[in-house]
Amino acid sequence: MAVGKEILTKIRSVQNTQKITKAMQMVSTSKMRKTQDRMRLARPYAEKVRTVMSHLAQTNADHGIKLLEPHREVRRAGFILITSDKGLCGGLNANVLKKFLAQVQEYQEQGIEVEVVCLGSKGLAACQSIGLNVIASATNLGDTPKMELLLGPLTEIFQRYEKHELDRIHMVYSRFVNTMRQEPRMEVLLPIGENVIDDGTGHSSFTWEYLYEPSPIAVLEYLVRRYLESVVYQALSDNMASEQAARMVAMKAATDNAGNAIKELCLVYNKSRQAAITTELSEIVAGAAAV
């Protein structure tokens, strides 16, 4: 019965693993709901900032704000790469990195230099392993990321755009569609598109006027920063919701696979036990017949 003992050991090992994956599935389900709530709560703020910024930009065309000025030629491109800090979330990070690296390769073939800001340890490790120029990073962001952790890296890359050290900035992350679907997304963060500097109604001007202190330009310059930060935070929240959804699905699949493995091992154990009993009975009968 040495074989039977080995099978029992494997069954217990798989059962222990199943308990872990089941617990991780339940934790991911709870965290996913919280990240979805955070996404919904962050959206109204970003929309209101965009609305006020649009009004100020349209009524102050000669604002002279560098973050709103497009660069004529792209010689250097920057990326804000958003990935998770932890694994066990299926192909989530792999899909984001695939989209990111495809664009990086395209730029490199055109002779365009690339610089990267990494939010998340998985993206940072991938960029370092292939020798990309990482100018700033933020890792170990936790389940509830704080804007204070993002300000340093974001300020670094935005200042490079203002100084014309970067001509375009992309943001790459995983967009949360639903529990079963998360899609890699790449957006141009800078220069800010004309669709952003619009009131969203198709009209090119606003009928309402406000007085801004200390001046409309000063307020606009402040809001542009806040808008960009809110867009990145929204993308980070999307990515975290995608991470928890992907992990929940992956852990459910692992739990189901563990259950199937336990059934198969139990079947093998019962067959080996039955064969051992049959052999013993045959030996007893043969011994009795010999007597």
Predicted regions and their residues:
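C-terminal beta-strand-loop-alpha-helix "lid" module of Rossmann-like NAD(P)-dependent dehydrogenases
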Residues: M1-V291
